[in-house]
Amino acid sequence: METGEIVELRELETELAPELVALGRVVGLGASRMLALGRELDVSTVDQLRSALEQGRLRAVSGIGPATEARIREGLERAPRARRGLTLERSRALSASLAAALGAEFAGESRRSCELSYELSLVRATDRPAAVLDEFASLPSVVSVLERGQAHAVGLTVEGIPVRIHACRPGSFGTALLRATGSREYVAALEPLPEAPDEISLFERLGLAYCPPELRERAGTTAPAELVELADLRGDLHCHTTWSDGRGSVLEMALAARELGHEYLAICDHTPQVRVVPGLGAEDLRRQGEEIHEVNERLAPFRVLRGVECDIRPDGTLDADDDVLAELDWVQISLHAGQRRPRAELTKVVTEAMRNPHARGLSHPKGRILNHRPENALDLDELFQVALETGVALEVNGLPDRLDLSAAHVEEALAAGIRLVLSSDAHSTRGLANVELAVATARKGGATVSDVVNTSGVDDLVRSPGGGTRR
């Protein structure tokens, strides 16, 4: 850590693989049990454990009976062969919890708002590094210490992911934090680094403008004048209620959004095309509109917008008639089925839907589910062109396992002149906080206030009752 170098994760995995602990969580075996199993079989990866099972070696391990062997076999059949990372939501929560327990700051991939993290990183300023490392080793969430030096240690968490802590002198905390935050490419371009107590001082001593952690992926990156912040959002334009697959009523969602400081909230429940959840037809939307009107009378000046997440049909038409959509304040369009269609076909369907004059935003354009489903084949260059022609904003969806558009695609969209809508896609009052992840993703892509539709006031979005049609 003093030199900016990080021990390769695969070196740690030869001693003890996080995969085994993660598998244990799947099959209901504790971390210590899985660690002992790994040591007894001399295996450190899921694939090695799979081989041991096929060779019949598990039966020789004390305490592994037929029932446990069957559970492990079932878990291995379900276990993904590709390496999984922690989502940004989970990596931030775990990093923050560990940091709070140690009086430290979290760094690494979590601090850079990476969509997936494969290692956590902490930095603690102290004059007693040994005591800090002892405290780290005793944390209930650290199941094993893999490596320990005079001022750093690497442990394995109950999540099956390595966590690295670096103890440094208070006067060099800023330097240590920057190195631990990374990326290695970004930091290497700044070396040699002066000692500094905080990052602001460090950048000043380097003669550079401060670079937010989210942008520290490539060497030489400089920040735009003002990245968008959570406080810049004036409303959330995508959430669900008990009218479809949500768990909060219109009133409950509105009250929670107001508590977060929003000025408005668009209710965007599903249409019937999404057959796996209840969908709203024309009369349902009108009845919901009556309920929204009552909530608005109660909560004014806070505004609940009549919206919909309108599914895109296989032929590119929308799953609601134009006269119904014309009554609404905000229309999100989205594709749920048919994500694996060929590139040209998929792009034609989505762009045709975007040309509907009532469409205002396109939800989760690339259709991915982190760790589970890859992006679809949608041609983003063509999508951007149609977005420019129609004025449809592209969503940065804040659901923890979506974050779609990704930060990389946000950067591409901004370069093309596209505007974004940062949404929670909340299905509960708690889910409204997802917008923080949308903001983090947009920031990582370089988005500023002017790039984001919902930094505007409600009057700029809705010009009259039922004013959801584009200009």
Where are these regions (language model features)?
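Accessory alpha-helical DNA-binding modules that contact the DNA backbone or grooves
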Residues: 1-120, 124-153, 160-164, 173-175, ...
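Gly/Ser/Thr-rich helix-start
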Residues: 31, 66, 109, 236, ...
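Active-site catalytic microenvironments in core metabolic enzymes, especially phosphate/sugar-handling
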Residues: 307-310, 437
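Charged catalytic cores and adjacent phosphate/nucleic-acid-binding surfaces used
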Residues: 113-131, 135-188, 192-241, 247-261, ...
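Short linear capping/connector segments at secondary-structure termini
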Residues: 14-18, 271-273, 309, 368
